[in-house]
Amino acid sequence: MPSKAENLRPSEPAPQPPEGRTLQGQLPGAPLAQRAGSPPDVPGSESPALACSTPATPSGEDPPARAAPIAPRPPARPRLERALSLDDKGWRRRRFRGSQEDLEARNGTSPSRGSVQSEGPGAPAHSCSPPCLSTSLQEIPKSRGVLSSERGSPSSGGNPLSGVASSSPNLPHRDAAVAGSSPRLPSLLPPRPPPALSLDIASDSLRTANKVDSDLADYKLRAQPLLVRAHSSLGPGRPRSPLACDDCSLRSAKSSFSLLAPIRSKDVRSRSYLEGSLLASGALLGADELARYFPDRNVALFVATWNMQGQKELPPSLDEFLLPAEADYAQDLYVIGVQEGCSDRREWETRLQETLGPHYVLLSSAAHGVLYMSLFIRRDLIWFCSEVECSTVTTRIVSQIKTKGALGISFTFFGTSFLFITSHFTSGDGKVAERLLDYTRTVQALALPRNVPDTNPYRSSAADVTTRFDEVFWFGDFNFRLSGGRTVVDALLCQGLVVDVPALLQHDQLIREMRKGSIFKGFQEPDIHFLPSYKFDIGKDTYDSTSKQRTPSYTDRVLYRSRHKGDICPVSYSSCPGIKTSDHRPVYGLFRVKVRPGRDNIPLAAGKFDRELYLLGIKRRISKEIQRQQALQSQNSSTICSVS
């Protein structure tokens, strides 16, 4: 069958495409470029989509074959397979809003939504089916000047629309030039800096609660959201959804939520038959309960020692002692050891309860002569303690007054066993051997634990009580002195405004003996940055000014030992220079102790505490507050009369 090109007579010119239907970048009479990715042309085959745009050459066939001429039909209107994106359409609408002169200067003719005009001669041919434009904001078409400059580049691949689909970083400036009449948007930045925050939210609890475990467990998505109890919506007549979901890994104490964690019904219905196992579900001392109270498994501990010199008069306030200024928060456990305590031990414990307030209860207390030890704990933690056991050691002859010796208290908190020992060793500058003997007698004679099982019996020794517990704190008046005499020590203390504490510690007898390994084996002491705590004139800040001229020394110390390295982290170690009722200054230490989950098959204290002392301390605290308010009211109501 003869082709359409062959049916054209040689003398007849090829029909021209209608005006206004020339593709962008196509010269009149030029064939369309082949689309990228289309199959190559096969000789002898013709594509119906390609319209004739050049005159046909005469064929070599016989005249009879051309006898029946066929009237040529105009070529089909070329179709632009161009999918305009929403961004491109919006850009076109913005261009149409401009002035007619600007449009004519840019396009030459009125733009047509269905076709694209040629920009000039020599432009590469347009492919039949350009790819669809992306709807991304980064692919808004460029201006005509940028488009025409990219048509001749080889990177465009002969496609003039490739510049249209490219991004332009100068889009805001171009839009401002096109729509020059539109007002400029104001700056988003405030004209002045914002006011200062009235509340400082930086706290130590947020820093510790945000610690990341080694397995990055805090950054993994939890399978079930945490449930936080709304403050009072569990009663009848309340909303149907009393529990709010909180997907945050950090439990924040918000004012609209209660600190009392909800208990799910399925946890109450579940029964655990793994008695004494760490994997038991719903265990009182298990890992789940420990994580609820201590997400980082660290308990805050306060340990203090004070030689009261038998004074009956107590300081008017113990806030500096129990609540030091450098601690932003109160501790979870308070252990106070006293040597040569006051005659009224009950009054001393009442003052401690009054100072700590209703948040703490006396878990246990013990006495050995004038050696006292009191153990206060937060009232919501008493359920996780085992029975408390105590033992005493006398290092002097029985007939004498029990002023020298040791007192030990032990218990298990969750799955970690604690031992606290307070001691008063032999006094005297040159009696180092006697003090070493007091230490040996103490570690051998303290009979602890008795009923509470050892958490790790394979690492215990019958000859040393400190090896039978996970965490051991030993504090008291050890009576180790600074050697060298009063003159040498006074010279170091009076060198300048800042005392050279490391130079003083070079003369310390205790540090010297610990380095030899003759005492406190395996124990450590926090770094000392305070002045010697002994011996002061009562009520003054001067050291002993009597005829004895005793050498200032670090007699009061706090030491610690742990079965597992790194379990005890000292936070602060200091003295209380403001308490001057004794010739000794109180010394305290703040610690962070790692706690492990435990088993429920141990003898539990079951919430036991000194209820009578608790009520007495709260009553006295309230009465003093009332007296303080009355004093303020009387002071405000008083007036000054002036006689004119």
Curated annotation (Swiss-Prot):
Q: Where is the composition biased (Low complexity)?
A: 152-163
Comp. bias (Polar residues): 107-118
The catalytic activity, as recorded, is: a 1,2-diacyl-sn-glycero-3-phospho-(1D-myo-inositol-4,5-bisphosphate) + H2O = a 1,2-diacyl-sn-glycero-3-phospho-(1D-myo-inositol 4-phosphate) + phosphate; a 1,2-diacyl-sn-glycero-3-phospho-(1D-myo-inositol-3,4,5-trisphosphate) + H2O = a 1,2-diacyl-sn-glycero-3-phospho-(1D-myo-inositol-3,4-bisphosphate) + phosphate; a 1,2-diacyl-sn-glycero-3-phospho-(1D-myo-inositol-3,5-bisphosphate) + H2O = a 1,2-diacyl-sn-glycero-3-phospho-(1D-myo-inositol-3-phosphate) + phosphate
Q: Where is this region: Disordered?
A: 1-193
The GO cellular component terms are:
axoneme; Golgi apparatus; Golgi cisterna membrane; nucleus; plasma membrane; ruffle
Instruction: Give residues with lipid attachment (S-farnesyl cysteine).
Output: C641
Region of interest: 13 X 4 AA repeats of P-X-X-P: 10-242
Question: Its principal location?
Answer: cytoplasm
E.C. code: 3.1.3.36, 3.1.3.86
Q: Can the keyword Zinc be found in this entry's annotation?
A: no
Role this protein plays: Phosphatidylinositol (PtdIns) phosphatase that specifically hydrolyzes the 5-phosphate of phosphatidylinositol-3,4,5-trisphosphate (PtdIns(3,4,5)P3), phosphatidylinositol 4,5-bisphosphate(PtdIns(4,5)P2) and phosphatidylinositol 3,5-bisphosphate (PtdIns(3,5)P2). Specific for lipid substrates, inactive towards water soluble inositol phosphates. Plays an essential role in the primary cilium by controlling ciliary growth and phosphoinositide 3-kinase (PI3K) signaling and stability.
| This protein's name | Phosphatidylinositol polyphosphate 5-phosphatase type IV
